[in-house]
Each structure stands twice: as structure tokens, then as C-alpha cells.
């Protein structure tokens, strides 16, 4: 791993992608914590996927968290993970970052970067000073079933999204400008009117530049300029 990432809490990772013969429009589904009150959404996804390889077989939709057979769901997930690995449907992008462009159904494009998060640098406790903090409340009763899915899982399918405070646009925007010259790793429509997704593998030089940009955002000077408010407290006037 590029040593420049060692103190950032976000790193390049070994990223598994389906091989070219997999139908990506059936492979990709939304995160497990979406549409929790709409089981009919997940029923439609089930019909769309059918017997095709899909991440639907590798996640526990949280619409099913209270199902009486949730332990069977979890066992099936772990079995599907092992099956996909044994069948060799994945290729591995070693020590990589992927720049993505997500075209929404309303025409807006969201830009991002896929890598690995160091959970030792994360804390969801309100008021935490950790490098990576929660932006919303954590639903604690959803943690145990998520932990059970991961306990015997041979692969990991995280869906965490991090926000960066980058007013000078040093991290993502240089990749956007270079996207047409980068190696494309996927480009397809998402199911259920989910829009379109494109992914591009970063070069070694681009990974190095991302590390430098992120490091610049975490310097003491940068943190103070953005977040430190100096409060002057006067001594009380004595009579």
C-alpha cells in the first residue's frame, strides 16, 4: 500500500469485480438498508435478478431483518459468497481506487471514489473527534444482524459513504477532468430506474495525487482554518 495513506483512514484496496460475462445490470443492487418499508421493491428485484449472479445473493436486505427465517437468509448469503469465489466469477483489482460517476434518474451526476475505510478511525458516538465520524444517528438494533452476516463471510460488501470537506476541490475534481483518459472498469444502467454508473481505475500517479490531496485536508493548518473558532473570554470585572 502507498505509505502516504497510512494516517488517512481511507486506503486503496483489493476490489472484487465480476468478470465481463456477468450482466452488471442484474449484478448491482442498492444497499441493504434501502427500501426497508417497501418489501415490494425487493420482490421486484428478486424477479429481475432470477438465477443470474447478483449482489442480491450477498446481502441481507433490512426489509427482512425481522423475518422468522433470518438465520437461513444469513446462511444462504455466506454459501453464495463461497460459491461465487469457487466459480471464479470475480477479477481482483489489487491495491486500487475506483473513480465513479453516478448518473441519477433526474439527470444529476454524483462523483465519488471507492476504496477501503479503516474502521479503527471511525466512531459513531455524537461529538466524537475521530478522523471519520457519523453524520447521522446509528440505528443500534440493526448492528447485531449485520455483524452476524459478516461473522463467517469470506468477502465484504460495505456500503458506507464518506463525505469530504474539500472546498478547493483537490480530490475528486482532477479525476473528473481526466476520466476520458482513464481505464474504464464498468459502464452500465442500474435497475429500477436507478440511473447509470461508470467506474474508472486510478493509475499509480493518480492514487499518489489523491493521497497528497487528502493529506493536505488533514494538516493542522487546514483543520484550524476550517473548524477552529477562537473565543476570547475576559476576566470578570471585580467590584
Regions found by a protein language model. Give the residues of each.
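Helix-hairpin-helix/helix-loop-helix acidic hairpins
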Residues: 191-228
Amino acid at each position: 500500500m502507498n505509505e502516504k495513506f497510512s494516517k488517512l483512514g481511507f486506503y486503496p484496496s483489493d476490489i472484487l469485480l465480476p468478470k465481463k460475462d456477468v450482466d452488471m445490470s442484474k449484478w448491482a443492487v442498492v444497499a441493504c438498508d434501502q427500501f426497508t418499508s417497501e418489501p415490494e421493491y425487493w420482490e421486484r428485484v428478486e424477479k429481475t435478478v432470477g438465477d443470474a449472479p447478483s449482489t442480491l445473493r450477498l446481502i441481507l436486505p433490512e426489509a427482512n431483518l425481522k423475518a422468522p427465517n433470518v438465520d437461513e437468509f444469513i446462511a444462504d448469503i455466506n454459501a453464495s459468497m463461497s460459491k461465487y469465489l469457487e466459480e471464479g466469477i470475480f477479477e481482483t483489482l489489487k491495491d486500487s481506487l475506483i473513480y465513479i460517476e453516478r448518473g441519477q434518474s433526474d439527470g444529476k451526476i454524483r462523483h465519488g471514489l471507492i476504496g477501503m475505510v479503516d474502521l479503527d478511525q471511525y466512531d459513531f458516538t455524537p461529538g466524537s473527534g475521530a478522523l471519520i465520524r457519523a453524520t447521522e444517528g446509528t440505528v443500534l438494533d440493526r448492528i447485531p444482524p449485520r455483524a452476524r452476516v459478516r461473522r463467517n463471510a469470506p468477502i465484504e460488501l460495505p456500503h458506507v459513504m464518506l463525505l469530504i470537506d474539500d472546498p478547493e476541490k483537490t480530490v475528486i475534481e482532477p479525476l473528473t477532468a481526466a476520466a476520458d483518459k482513464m481505464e474504464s472498469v464498468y459502464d452500465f444502467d442500474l435497475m429500477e430506474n436507478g440511473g447509470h454508473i461508470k467506474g474508472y481505475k486510478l493509475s499509480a500517479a493518480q492514487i499518489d495525487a489523491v493521497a497528497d490531496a487528502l493529506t493536505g485536508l488533514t494538516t493542522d493548518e487546514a483543520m484550524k482554518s476550517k473548524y477552529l473558532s477562537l473565543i476570547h473570554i475576559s476576566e470578570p470585572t471585580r467590584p
